């Protein structure tokens, strides 16, 4: 999973982009280890469930936006098979470098340095677009969704896996305490990067809940939207489609 005291809502788009870029440039080599620790390894089971719901077809073409160190990219490559193709895109060169080390031996993966707000692809070319714990880092959530909508083929699927907001009182209180006190401490102890990982606390609190995100996806044009919260609602999967052409 992906500041300091200044809230990002006070930053313009360029300032937020630069801040987030610096965060991931600095934590790239420690990102995977700390993710396992701060999520208690739950992020793997969330993604496993999500992949089952996607039921990816062999031979498909997929785009993993904000691919980070490449874990979901690799799973998508396995799912589409040798006749499929998966592109992982990220704006952090250092995160891509880690991903490259994991994917050098995988023939159907291509990694690209690029901007999720201006995807370097033509319209209507991907069967699937995915974004895992990256949407909240974009300066404009709706613009990011619009770009993924644009590059999807009609009938194509988008899947968003992201932090969310627990609704049960026990989980809600625990969530606030964990992100405010425990998670930044993990960052300091295990990654020597409390400053960078405090961004996770902030971006998670500011990101819409699962119901609001579903509405935002509908406003973008996606249909047949379904979502599911995980682990008391601390994260959520959203799955939707670009309408088929009439």
From Swiss-Prot:
Pathway: Quinol/quinone metabolism; menaquinone biosynthesis; menaquinol from 1,4-dihydroxy-2-naphthoate: step 2/2. SUPFAM superfamilies: S-adenosyl-L-methionine-dependent methyltransferases (SSF53335). It catalyses: a 2-demethylmenaquinol + S-adenosyl-L-methionine = a menaquinol + S-adenosyl-L-homocysteine + H(+). The keyword Mitochondrion does not apply. The keyword Oxidoreductase does not apply. Keywords: Menaquinone biosynthesis, Methyltransferase, S-adenosyl-L-methionine, Transferase. Gene3D superfamilies: Vaccinia Virus protein VP39 (3.40.50.150). It is an enzyme of class 2 (transferase). GO terms for biological process: menaquinone biosynthetic process; methylation. It holds the Pfam family Ubie_methyltran. S-adenosyl-L-methionine binds at residues 69, 90, 115-116. Its EC number is 2.1.1.163. One of its GO terms (molecular function) is demethylmenaquinone methyltransferase activity. Belongs to the class I-like SAM-binding methyltransferase superfamily. MenG/UbiE family. HAMAP family: MenG_UbiE_methyltr. Methyltransferase required for the conversion of demethylmenaquinol (DMKH2) to menaquinol (MKH2). NCBIfam families: MenG_MenH_UbiE, PRK00216.1-4, PRK00216.1-5. This is Demethylmenaquinone methyltransferase.
């Amino acid at each position: 999973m992906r500041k300091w005291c200044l809230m990002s809502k006070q930053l313009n788009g360029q300032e937020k982009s630069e801040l987030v870029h610096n965060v991931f440039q600095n934590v790239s080599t420690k990102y995977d280890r700390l993710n396992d620790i701060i999520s208690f390894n739950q992020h793997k089971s969330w993604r496993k469930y999500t992949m089952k719901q996607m039921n990816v077809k062999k031979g498909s073409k997929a785009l993993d936006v904000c691919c980070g160190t490449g874990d979901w990219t690799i799973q998508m490559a396995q799912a589409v098979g040798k006749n499929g193709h998966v592109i992982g895109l990220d704006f952090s060169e250092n995160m891509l470098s880690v991903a490259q080390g994991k994917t050098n031996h995988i023939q159907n993966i291509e990694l690209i340095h690029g901007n999720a707000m201006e995807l370097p692809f033509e319209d209507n070319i991907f069967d699937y677009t995915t974004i895992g714990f990256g949407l909240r880092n974009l300066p404009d959530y709706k613009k990011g969704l619009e770009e993924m909508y644009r590059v999807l083929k009609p009938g194509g699927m988008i899947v968003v896996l992201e932090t969310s907001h627990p609704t049960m009182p026990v989980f809600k209180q625990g969530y606030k305490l964990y992100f405010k006190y425990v998670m930044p401490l993990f960052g300091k102890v295990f990654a020597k990067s409390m400053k960078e990982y405090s961004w996770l606390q902030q971006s998670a609190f500011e990101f819409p809940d699962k119901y609001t995100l579903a509405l935002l996806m509908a406003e973008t044009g996606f249909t047949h939207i379904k979502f599911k919260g995980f682990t008391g609602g601390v994260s959520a999967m959203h799955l939707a489609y670009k309408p088929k052409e009439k």
